[in-house]
Each structure stands twice: as structure tokens, then as C-alpha cells.
């Protein structure tokens, strides 16, 4: 008996981009894992339910070394969705897939509410690319605990406070017109010029271009004060505003 197909409906396959945290281990790996443990201990839940890409381009790993690293991360409940900087031949069944060419992209159109000036001409990008404008996303209300605001295209401004357990992730700078009690990550896609500004600093975690500082690292003199933070020689610097 021959089955006749009278309804030929296609299967829709969509391409979509998501913002993920990228972990870039450094040698020696044991010491890097200790620093990762320190971050996880001082910022509980940072990796919980968060997509993570493992970039091993700075390491010289064989297949066994890669498996050991993945096992060490699984023990720490860090779920790896993909691996960057690895030869496809090193990927075995059951391992996360090999990724390459990651770049920011938006799945949801966000209306730009402000446009900043062009980047200075005397500081061109090494790749020769020219970013014409930097967009800004303005949140006109406080950010509640458990909320996560991600805007890789540019700056994020919050007219209000950011509660403990909430987070702001921006490709550019972060401006908080209120108390910053949660997490703020600026320059998330690689922007050493990004800054963090807030009217009251009580943050759980701060990060600029991948360099982080947790609550215990903040100078007591700056707690509860209006503060700006910036990156200098791979170190986060902070100063009181006004």
C-alpha cells in the first residue's frame, strides 16, 4: 500500500543569536580554576542557568586535557553550550559542539532611545572596522531581583535602582541613577573604554571587559557613595563622583 502525501508542509528552521558568557581559561589551569571557585563563592549563582561558551584558544590542550577541563567545569555546575578555539577533531560524542565566528546580534529589535557621538578617529579599531554610533537602552523603572537586562549593542541606563540578585549586561557603559545592589557588567563584548556609573554603590559584582570585582573587593570608603568605575591596565579602578 502506497501512502500519498497530499499536504507538503515545510519545516521552519530559524537562525538566532544569543548573548552568552565566555570563559577563557589561562595557564596554569589549576590556578585559573581556583580563581573561578573564588568568583563563584563570592557571587553565588553567577553561572546558574547561564549559557557559557568555553574559549580555549589561549591553551595548548590535547583531547585528554580538554576532557579534564570540561569535567572540572561540570563539577562546578558550569554548563558549557559550546567550545571555541578547538580543532573539530578533538570533539567527541557527548561533548559540546565546536563554535567559531561568534559575534553579537539582536533577536529582538530594541528601539534606540539615544545616540552617542562617534568614536574618536584617533583610536581606530585594530580590525579596521568603524562603529558609526553607539546606541543606548533606557530602563525607566527599577530592575527587580531576578531580572537580567542584556544589551550588547551599547550603553544601558537605569532610571532607578538595581536590586540584589538582578544584573545589567551592556556592550558599552552602564549608568545607574539609583542604588546598584546587583551585578553590573560593562564592555561585555570587548570594550576597554566602557565604564560603570551609579549614585549608590552596593554592588554584588562589577565587571568591565571581563575583568571583575566582587563586593569584598570594594573599598569601604566607596560603599553607599556615588561612584564611577573604569578599566586601567587590566585592573578596575574606582573613584567617588562629585
Swiss-Prot record:
Keywords: Cell cycle, Cell division, Septation
Any one biological process term the GO annotation gives: cell morphogenesis
GN (gene name): minC
Protein's job: Cell division inhibitor that blocks the formation of polar Z ring septums. Rapidly oscillates between the poles of the cell to destabilize FtsZ filaments that have formed before they mature into polar Z rings. Prevents FtsZ polymerization.
Species the sequence originates in: Agrobacterium fabrum (strain C58 / ATCC 33970)
Lineage, opening ranks: Bacteria, Pseudomonadati, Pseudomonadota, Alphaproteobacteria, Hyphomicrobiales
Name the UniProt record assigns to this protein: Probable septum site-determining protein MinC
Gene3D superfamilies given in the database record: 2.160.20.70, 3.30.70.260
Subunit structure: Interacts with MinD and FtsZ.
Pfam families documented for this protein: MinC_C (PF03775), MinC_N (PF05209)
Family, per entry: Belongs to the MinC family.
Amino acid at each position: 500500500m502506497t501512502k500519498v502525501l497530499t499536504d507538503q508542509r515545510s519545516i521552519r528552521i530559524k537562525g538566532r543569536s544569543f548573548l552568552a558568557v565566555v570563559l577563557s581559561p589561562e595557564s596554569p589551569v589549576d590556578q585559573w580554576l581556583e580563581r573561578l571557585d573564588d568568583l563563584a563563592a563570592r557571587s553565588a549563582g553567577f553561572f546558574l542557568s547561564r549559557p557559557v561558551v568555553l574559549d580555549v584558544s589561549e591553551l595548548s590542550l590535547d583531547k585528554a586535557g580538554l576532557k579534564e577541563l570540561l569535567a572540572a567545569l561540570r563539577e562546578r555546575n558550569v554548563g558549557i553550550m559550546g567550545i571555541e578555539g578547538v580543532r573539530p577533531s578533538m570533539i567527541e560524542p557527548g561533548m559540546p559542539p565546536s563554535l567559531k565566528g561568534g559575534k553579537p546580534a539582536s533577536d529582538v529589535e530594541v528601539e534606540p532611545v539615544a545616540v552617542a557621538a562617534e568614536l574618536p578617529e584617533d583610536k581606530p579599531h585594530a580590525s579596521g572596522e568603524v562603529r558609526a554610533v553607539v546606541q543606548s537602552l533606557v530602563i525607566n523603572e527599577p530592575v527587580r531581583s531576578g531580572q537580567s537586562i542584556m544589551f550588547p549593542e551599547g550603553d544601558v541606563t537605569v532610571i532607578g535602582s538595581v536590586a540584589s540578585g538582578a544584573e545589567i549586561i551592556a556592550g558599552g557603559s552602564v549608568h545607574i541613577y539609583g542604588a546598584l545592589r546587583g551585578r553590573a557588567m560593562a564592555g561585555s563584548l570587548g570594550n576597554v573604554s566602557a565604564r560603570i556609573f551609579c549614585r549608590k554603590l552596593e554592588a554584588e559584582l562589577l565587571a568591565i571587559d571581563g575583568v571583575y570585582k566582587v563586593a569584598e573587593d570594594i573599598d569601604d570608603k566607596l560603599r553607599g557613595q556615588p561612584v564611577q568605575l573604569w578599566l586601567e591596565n587590566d585592573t578596575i579602578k574606582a573613584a567617588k563622583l562629585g
